């Protein structure tokens, strides 16, 4: 299977987890997903009062500089870890 196909499968499988991952795990997945699909963050940091938006922005910004391929590989690894931990 190609890297893109593995990534797409991992993204699909993560949505089927039996238990919701904790916020830190979700933020890491979000950041890796956005880096994989879009690349380096290209939007301004949300307002201070937009806590959810700010958390998402920070998670994506942490992945800045990671190539799309490396981000996909990291996402796949994290997805496998969560699937083992929570089951699907």
From Swiss-Prot:
Keyword Ribosomal protein: no
Biological process, per Gene Ontology: fatty acid metabolic process
Signal peptide: none
Positions contributing to an acyl-CoA binding: 15, 30-34, 56, 75
Ranges of residues in domain ACB: 3-88
Superkingdom of origin organism: Eukaryota
The name this protein goes by in its record: Acyl-CoA-binding domain-containing protein 7
Organism in which the protein naturally occurs: Bos taurus (Bovine)
Lineage of producing organism: Eukaryota, Metazoa, Chordata, Craniata, Vertebrata
Gene that this polypeptide is encoded by: ACBD7
């Amino acid at each position: 299977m190609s890297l893109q196909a593995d990534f797409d499968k991992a993204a699909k499988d993560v949505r089927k987890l039996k238990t919701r991952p904790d916020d830190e795990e979700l933020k890491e997945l979000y950041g890796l997903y956005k880096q994989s699909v879009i690349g380096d963050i290209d939007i301004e940091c949300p307002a201070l009062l937009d806590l959810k938006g700010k958390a998402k922005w920070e998670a994506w910004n942490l992945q800045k500089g990671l190539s799309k391929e490396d981000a996909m590989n990291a996402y796949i690894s994290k997805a496998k870890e969560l699937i083992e931990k929570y089951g699907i």
